[in-house]
Structures are given as structure tokens and as C-alpha cells.
Amino acid sequence: MPLSTSLLGKKSTYKDSYDATLLFKIPRINNRNELGINSNNLPFYGVDIWNTYELSCLNKNGKPWVGVGTFYIPTDSENIVESKSFKLYLNSFNNFVVESVEELERIILQDLSNVTHAKVTGRIFPINTKIEFSIPSGKNIDDLDIVCNNYGPPDNSLIEYEDVLVEEEINSNLLKSNCLVTGQPDWGTIVIKYKGKKLKHDSFLKYLISFRNCNEFAEQCAERIFTDIKNAINPDFLSIYIVYTRRGGIDICPYRFTNKSYTLPSDKRFIRQ
């Protein structure tokens, strides 16, 4: 179905009962074709990590239960889920009776797997679960004294490098883009690890800032950044992790990396989550 038929950016009615048909799928291939990414031979591995903070249902006695969930959609899935449809879907559980949290988890994982055409994994936690905050790892480049005048579209010609090999990790809290459909701002913290020719931090920060008025989904922004870095310096290793702030009770954190055996980020969150 075309994106114009989704509920994103439209007035919506919340369902009183569980409804898996609320989930709206978006084929990944559309945005990947624009970036020159071969969906049959992806240049990366990874997941989209969805954290949900507004999750509730009824227990067998009719008493409400609330919790939070984390779901992992693999990058080789055929589809992603449109975020507002996921919000409406989760809220359809508000008056739905489940026998256990495990049953709720099973239903959600199965529905997400069905709509994405991939094996989605995840966990649901009680609301009193202790979650620690952390700061992004690596060197922060936000305090560099630069002059900016490009806020979109993203300009990969701004990526410059030195002809010296390094292995480093850098981060920035200045990434911002806008929702492709609604234009609402998406604020993100990005952590980049790579081994290869050294990125010039000042020019790379300008590149990140050039996303400021860009209208793209979070997943496409991550894959654009990954592709632009890969094309610029052809690193031996590269990982991109973007932690977006929540909108509508959901945050999306795309993670892309070149090494299949690379581990997922910790469960710790950054302060803006």
C-alpha cells in the first residue's frame, strides 16, 4: 500500500479492542533503491530497536497492567512498520485481557514478524524495572568551532578525511531530521565506530548538521549516513548507532554495522530518552 494510505499525519480513532490490522508496513526497498543499496546483498547487518513506553493491557481479573517493551526488527526484513500505526496497534491492547505478560509478548512479536516478513525479537518489562542512563561512548565532536550554512538536503561532499589509518569512535548530539510525512522533528544522538581513513571531525559535523531540514524516516537517515561514510573512506569496519528521542511513546534506534558478529548496544539509555 502507498504511504499516502497510512494514518501518519491524519486524525485517528483509537480502537477499543485488539486489532493487528492496524499495523502498516512500508517496504524497505523503496528507500534503499534511492540510496543505491542492493536489498539482496546488503552492505551491513543490524537491527532497528524500538522502545515502547506506553504499553498496557488487562489481566484476567480486568485489572490494568502497564509496562515497557523493546523490539528488534532485523535490517533484512522486507518491511518496516510505520510508527503511528504501531502506536495505535499498541493502544488497541488497553482493554484487551491477557493471561500473562508472556502472552502479550508472544502476540506482539508474532504480529510484528508477520507484517515485517522477518523474525522479530524483543522483551516486555514491568514498569518498575531499573534502567540506567549512560553517556554516548567515544569522542564528542559537538564543541568544535565551525561555521554552518547547509541544513539540507544532506550533502555527502562535506565528508573529508585524512590519508592516515585510525580506529576511533565519535559521537554527536546534533543530529536532527524531520518525519517524511508529518515534518515533525526527529532528534538523535549518533555514535560511530570505524577503522579506516580518519574522518575530519569538523567537516563531518557539518555533514551531520546538513540533515537538519531533511525529511526522511529514521531508518533511511541511518542507512544514508552509513552509505556516505562507506563510499567516502571505504573503512575496514563501520558501525552506526542512532538513538532518537521518543515521539508518541516510541523511540526508534537504528543500528548498522559491517561485522556480522558485532554485539548489540547495552540496554542503557541516553539522557534524552
UniProtKB/Swiss-Prot annotation:
It comes from Rickettsia felis (strain ATCC VR-1525 / URRWXCal2) (Rickettsia azadi). Pfam families: QueF, QueF_N. It is an enzyme of class 1 (oxidoreductase). Homodimer. It is found in: Cytoplasm. The active site is at C179, D186. The keyword DNA-binding does not apply. It catalyses: 7-aminomethyl-7-carbaguanine + 2 NADP(+) = 7-cyano-7-deazaguanine + 2 NADPH + 3 H(+). Its EC number is 1.7.1.13. SUPFAM superfamilies: Tetrahydrobiopterin biosynthesis enzymes-like (SSF55620). Keywords: Cytoplasm, NADP, Oxidoreductase, Queuosine biosynthesis. Catalyzes the NADPH-dependent reduction of 7-cyano-7-deazaguanine (preQ0) to 7-aminomethyl-7-deazaguanine (preQ1). InterPro entries: GTP-CH-I_C/QueF, NADPH_dep_7-cyano-7-deazaG_red, QueF, QueF_N, QueF_type2. NADPH binds at S83, K84, R247, G248. GO terms for molecular function: preQ1 synthase activity. Belongs to the GTP cyclohydrolase I family. QueF type 2 subfamily. It comes from the Bacteria. This is NADPH-dependent 7-cyano-7-deazaguanine reductase. Pathway: tRNA modification; tRNA-queuosine biosynthesis. GO terms for biological process: queuosine biosynthetic process; tRNA modification.
